[in-house]
Amino acid sequence: MNIGKYIFAQVIDFIPRYQFDKLVKKYKGDWHAKDLSCYNQLLHLLFGQITGCVSIRDICLCLEAHGSSIYHLGIRKSVNQSNLCRANEKRDYRIYEGLGMYLIGIVRPMYSNTKVAEITIDNVLYALDSTTISTSIVLAAWALGKYSKGAVKMHALLDLRGSIPANIHITDGKWHDSNELDEIVPEPFAFYMMDKAYVDFIALFRFHKAGAYWISRPKDNMRYEVVNHRIDFDPSTGICGDFIIKLTTHKSKKLYPEPIRMVTYHDSVTGNDVEFITNNFEISALEVANLYRHRWDIEVFFKWIKQNIVVKNLWGYSENAVRTHLWVAIIAYLIIAKIKADYKSPYSITEVATLIRVSALERVDLRDLITKPKDSIIQKQNFKELTLFDEF
């Protein structure tokens, strides 16, 4: 039991300190450090992420206001805004990148048995996508985006079993999504769901030869011919067609010489027919559509990262500061995911993060906080609401 210990102090107990110290030593993070060590910098930034501070100024102001409690939060000493900004600019971001990748290796296996809704196959399922964070081209000249604007891209390969990232890659805004396939080592028998921006037949054929499966949507200018019709589908499920096609342009059929499967699905909500392409010929046509639909799980992940883990406003503009900020955001997400798995919380990762955020400065037991049955909390809330209205 951790009654008497702040929630935030209990959360940071999940940081793999030995591994972090090894990274600090490797990249000489604490070289000539006085008041602000790399670990203290990490705690300041995690405090900002977990409590929802929107700027470095907010972090320092909040910790200063709780000066009498700061030691009990696990933070050795609070620092001013300029020192924290300077650390973000100068301390090697690879320290935090290394910690993030280490946590990915720990947390992903904890969710390996999680089932994906409406999916019957046991293959590993990945969604690949990116999110763009706008910034000032004047303040962040390194982060070139489209139309002479500044932008930073976070590319994520998300394991759909638990929505845990398998890989994170941060680039400037001009890095094309299809280039990201070159950064991935295909996993045999795994499914990779991606939108049409990733359709690069050289890379997709490399995935195919490696024994991996991919599902995407055809680009508008894709030229092909139907070589066979598959008839083993149920039209009542929304499947309109299941075909085997071959690419017909000289360049594309040279880049991808093998047949491709095309599935057409009628979306009853929008009234539109949607086409999918894949190199898998074994699963049902409806399974193809359902798998691609789960690609939207990564959009929910990005939206949650932006809204709940603080990346709406960047905490610095140099490349090192931006990468540090984004990696600390991912570290916060992974720590919360680890807490949920370790304590077998019935709540989603989002709900666990919310409970921790609103209780960060309370002295309660973390396990009790996130494992209380949902029904008891709802009943307690309803009782309070009824009591309130009974007074009128």
Each predicted region: which residue ranges?
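Extracellular beta-strand-rich solenoid/capping regions of secreted or surface-exposed proteins
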Residues: 143-145
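A short, hydrophobic/aromatic-rich structural module that often spans a beta strand
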Residues: 75, 112, 382-386
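Extended, structured, electrostatic nucleic-acid-contact surfaces
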Residues: 67-74
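Active-site- or DNA-interface-adjacent structural scaffold in DNA-acting proteins
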Residues: 76-141
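Single, function-defining residue in the core of a domain
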Residues: 1-58, 62, 98, 119-124, ...
